[in-house]
Design a protein with these regions (language model features):
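Secondary-structure boundary/capping micro-motif
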Residues: 2-316
Length: 316
């Protein structure tokens, strides 16, 4: 993939995206997706053992979805009952209470893979290891600060951050047939993303910025990949559970795409001081936007449609 200097969309480009008429409105998916966590919580029983809890939150899928409309479910579990049978029963209870059952369930904790996968499959739902769990992570953070401390048996000593860190994995090369020809850093005001439902997008996913209290004037950084095989590239990316784009500055310095529970893909080599500085600027812009950024796929810079567009977050 060749390197391209960092650019910013000019006002005309933003206007084209926001005010383009006669677009085909693309509905990414009508399927319901859930995000799930099943793990111990900082609440102790009478034997000083931690309670476990299953937390389920519906994935918002689009920028216009109201956070308050997302289906949520939670249920505590005695530590002696932690197994796939209990989790399956809890899933069945959640499905009975939900407006619609999910087609798949995302989960981010690798150490719970076997139990979660078994319970989901026995319930007839596809389990998907994924770090694209923005709504779930925000609900977990809220419970850590506003809910658990007010519960009987709360143990501040055992409370920990909701984020989970794992050792970095070695990035893989993108399939040869899906290599892009050019790429560019871009920036877009948060409020411009409100128009995303009007853009012509073949594959993608997003979430409401209200989930993260992002100011409408915040500059959201992004990366556009230009490819003559834009649609196949976007279709492939839609199936690997994108997580976030990240510039790393080891040896060698790279621009990588994180996906699934632990996968990473090389988008470009940052092989000179200029591209490395651009990568650092991209990372700083992400930090200023609470980790929010986007990845777009187009056939060429003149295209007015997107083969793919994903709103992403790297949650630290």
């Amino acid at each position: 993939m060749s390197e391209k200097l960092s650019i910013e969309w000019q006002n005309e480009r933003k206007s084209t995206l926001s005010n383009r008429s006669n677009l085909t409105l693309k509905i990414f998916t009508m399927a319901v997706i859930w995000e799930l966590d099943f793990y111990s919580r900082p609440i102790l029983d009478e034997n000083q053992k931690k309670y476990w809890e299953v937390i389920i939150c519906e994935s918002p899928l689009t920028v216009q979805r109201s956070p308050d409309s997302l289906f949520r479910f939670s249920k505590f579990c005695d530590g002696t009952q932690v197994n796939s049978v209990w989790l399956k029963e809890a899933l069945s209870e959640a499905i009975a209470k939900a407006p619609a059952p999910p087609s798949k369930i995302r989960f981010f904790r690798r150490q719970m893979n076997n139990m979660i996968c078994k319970a989901c499959k026995e319930t007839g739902i596809d389990p998907i290891p994924s770090r694209y769990t923005v709504a779930l992570q925000e609900w977990l953070k809220a419970r850590e600060t506003d809910f658990y401390p007010n519960q009987p048996g709360y143990d501040s000593a055992s409370a920990s951050t909701t984020s989970v860190s794992y050792p970095a994995t070695t990035p893989q090369l993108l399939p040869d047939a899906l290599q892009g020809q050019q790429w560019a850093y871009v920036n877009l005001e948060a409020q411009a993303l409100d128009e995303m439902p009007e853009w012509e997008i073949a594959f993608g996913e997003a979430f409401p910025l209200a989930l993260l209290d992002i100011d409408p004037q915040t500059s959201i950084p992004g990366l556009i990949i230009y490819s003559s095989r834009a649609v196949p590239l976007a279709a492939w990316m839609s199936g690997i559970e994108l997580a976030y784009v990240k510039a790393t500055f080891g040896t060698p310095a790279r621009l990588t795409l994180e996906s699934g529970a632990s996968d990473a893909w090389i988008l470009a080599q940052l092989s000179n001081p200029q591209t490395q500085q651009e990568g650092k600027n991209f990372e700083q812009a992400k930090q200023n936007a609470k980790g929010v950024h986007f990845l777009a796929i187009q056939s060429d810079p003149q295209s007015e449609s997107f083969a793919g567009f994903w709103l992403l977050q790297e949650d630290h």
